[in-house]
From Swiss-Prot:
The gene is aroC. Reduced FMN (FMNH(2)). It comes from Corynebacterium aurimucosum (strain ATCC 700975 / DSM 44827 / CIP 107346 / CN-1) (Corynebacterium nigricans). Homotetramer. Residues 277-307 are annotated as: Disordered. Gene3D superfamilies: Chorismate synthase AroC. This is Chorismate synthase. One of its GO terms (cellular component) is cytosol. GO terms for molecular function: chorismate synthase activity; FMN binding. Its cofactor is FMNH2. The keyword Lyase applies. Keywords: Amino-acid biosynthesis, Aromatic amino acid biosynthesis, FAD, Flavoprotein, FMN, Lyase, NADP.
């Protein structure tokens, strides 16, 4: 089974992504990964950190001459700001008798962060892990960690492209109270135009509404969330399974999206709108075609019974406003128990456009795992042979002659 994990802290020396059981022969380059990481930094409303937080990439293992080897892949993203944090984030014990060390740990970046931010991992993490301050929690819970996931997912994206010819696309539906985009669903041919939009929007009117929301929030010292949509065309029938809850592909995709920092809701297809419809209006009726079976609608978002049904996969994720609010919220100082205002770390006004790129990454990883579970293969060539045989079977299974 394809597996992935990440390690590292926001201001630590580096982030590391590890991918296991990726077949041999998948093309991948440092430029491929750098491109996806640059897309993650996109977006109107990002903070100053994006301007100098370069991604210093090193491909450590599992890749040779531009191809995966079949062995574990390790990718490191160095922190170009590490020299400023060597004392504060040192893995070695500190000598607090040293005046320079004591000074660094008593003020500025090193000062204890005892006032947890509402909406963040600070409070529960400090209690759960018995930390006296929030630094050990916020360093790992920071969305900076998603850079490692995006790096790992680049390999998965290339695998999906090589095996199925599919691409994973996202766009922003709305930011804050902006008028939501209700136009036609984009295709991968629209990706350059979407990425060229400051808010990764499909439509100029929607873009202007989103930018207006961000400008207003910035002036008011506030932050914003929003909704992103992920679309994948061309998936075969039968990825995932109905046989158990954990095998259902929609459950896996929802879990992966909910695992992104600040995501508070996930919708498959028309999702919550389906709950307001009658059954006769909610489901995608099937029609016979010369090629087999098609649908008149795609309200299910390409998933039925936990399996892909051959229609376009469509998912939405709702991101809450960033919890580091410039006009600090009320909290409790964990060192004294007294009322206080929350700590303020450098952050964005809005990170919804970037969340779409991270959502693409998680969908790509889950889909790559589903493809390998269905088709197997120790090499890319073997997986492609298995897929070709299955596609031949499906074509025959749905062949009844002219409609």
């Amino acid at each position: 089974m394809l597996r992935w994990t990440t390690a590292g802290e926001s201001h630590g020396q580096a982030l590391v992504a590890l991918i296991e059981h990726m077949p041999a022969g998948v093309p991948i380059s440092q430029d491929d990964i750098a491109l996806q990481l640059s897309r993650r930094r996109l977006g109107y409303g990002r903070g100053a950190r994006m301007k100098f937080e370069a991604d210093d990439l090193t491909l450590l293992s599992g890749i040779r001459h531009g191809l995966t080897l079949g062995s574990p892949i390790a990718i490191m993203i160095g922190n170009t700001e590490w020299p400023k944090w060597t004392t504060i984030m040192s893995p070695e014990a500190l000598d607090l008798e040293d005046p320079e060390v004591a000074k660094a740990m008593a003020s500025g970046r090193g000062a204890p962060l005892t006032r947890p931010r509402p909406g963040h991992a600070d409070f529960a993490g400090m209690v759960k892990f018995d930390h006296s301050e929030a630094r050990p929690i916020l360093e790992r819970s920071s969305a900076r960690e998603t850079a490692a996931r995006v790096a790992a997912a680049t390999v998965a994206r290339n695998f999906l492209r090589e095996t199925l010819g599919v691409e994973v696309l996202s766009h922003v539906i709305s930011i804050g109270a902006s008028a939501p985009y209700k136009g036609p669903h984009p295709s991968f041919a629209d990706i350059e135009a979407i990425d060229a939009s400051p808010v990764r929007a499909c439509d100029k009117t929607a873009e202007e509404s989103m930018i207006s929301e961000i400008e207003t929030a910035k002036k008011q010292g506030d932050t914003l969330g929003g909704i992103v949509e992920v679309i994948v065309e061309g998936l075969p029938i039968g990825l995932g399974s109905h046989t158990s809850g954990e095998d259902r592909l929609d459950a896996q995709l929802a879990a992966a999206l909910m695992g992104i920092q600040a995501i508070k809701g996930v919708e498959v297809g028309d999702g919550f709108a389906e709950a307001r419809r009658r059954g006769s209006e909610a489901h995608d009726e099937m029609v016979r075609t010369d090629e087999g079976v098609d649908r008149e609608t795609n309200r299910a978002g390409g998933l039925e019974g936990g399996m892909t049904n051959g229609q376009t996969l469509r998912l939405r994720a709702a991101m809450k406003p960033i919890s580091t609010v410039p006009r600090a919220l009320k909290t409790v100082d964990m060192s004294t128990g007294g009322s206080a205002t929350a700590i303020h770390q450098r952050s964005d006004v809005c990170a919804v456009p970037a969340a779409g790129v991270v959502a693409e990454a998680m969908v790509a990883l889950v889909l790559a795992r589903a493809v390998l579970e269905k088709f197997g293969g120790d090499s890319l060539a073997e997986t492609k042979r298995n897929i070709a045989a299955y596609q031949e079977y499906v074509a025959g299974r749905l062949e009844w002659g002219e409609a």
